[in-house]
Amino acid sequence: MTKTVRTCGKLYLAGEYSVLTAGQGAILKNIPIYMTGKIHFSERYQLFSDMFDHTVDLTPDDEYSLIQDTVAVMNEFLQSRSISLRPFFLTITGKMEQDGKKFGLGSSGSVVVLTIRAITALYGLALSAEETFKLATYVLLKRGDNGSMGDVACIAYEDLIYYQSFDRKRIAEQINESPLESILAQDWGTVIRRIQPHHPFDFFVGWTKEPAISRDLINQVKSAISSSFLTQTQEEVLRLEKALLAGEKEIMKESLEKVSHLLVELSPAIYNEKLIALKRASQGLDCVAKSSGAGGGDCGIALSFSETDSQILVERWRGAGIDLLYKERWGMDE
């Protein structure tokens, strides 16, 4: 019997870059543009992803290493629960791109969470969002990934969340010393809170159709991070979380403007011409817009508190060559 699962995309509202430092927070939103996994038991292991042009088994393959490593960890997890292993055929589709251009919504975390969900569905296991997050993070840490894991949290929880990063180095060092179950049972020091916005408003995702900055540039931006940047960003991230929960429109706008300004000060590479246009489109409107993620391309986000201004914002984006990728109504209408 074939099981079908899926994982969403994600975007940062605030806290990108700062959240790379343990103890720093960020706010992320799940985006319902999906990758899909189909899985069934088979006579031998077979893995296929539409990102590649070939099918593999568990023989090491550079292109499939992320999926294969996830399968290996999940097999270890299943055996720790005294579950007999059986081979399967896993198919993954959904590139989160258009005309070969990536939206910037997915991540390695998307693939790992999808693979975990597929395997647990096949074996009839029900994992919590926290368990899924920890397993996916374990896979990535074991591979040497040094990301914040905020994307993994957002994808695992499938919600608007506040995420506070933990000491990944400490957990990574234990991977070679302690069994999987022991590490999963620990308190990692992660903070993940779901956010239910109170004030009704529109959330928009604008796609620049340009790639994000290169890994080398990202590393340059990281090297510029100061204690002042971290302190100020954390203050605004927490203000934004409270404002979203309380429906305080002006504070939402102020906080997003401030974190946007902090990113501009951090590196001019974050806001390219398209992202500058995306942000400027909110000027004079009851809206606020900023870049999302690494910057230099991909997507930006906007909040609009007026139906009329929402239409104007989207028209301005269109005029600047920015596509409206996604729109969602947040909050509780009175």
Give the residues covered by each predicted segment.
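C-terminal nucleotide
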Residues: 2-14, 18-21, 28-84, 97-100, ...
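Short glycine/threonine-rich catalytic loop with a Thr-x-Gly-x-Asp
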Residues: 105-107, 289-296
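DPxDG-like acidic metal-binding loop motif
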Residues: 104-127, 159
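Hydrophobic alpha-helical hairpins/lids featuring a short glycine-rich hinge
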Residues: 90-94
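Short, charged, amphipathic alpha-helices and their helix-cap/turn boundaries
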Residues: 130-132
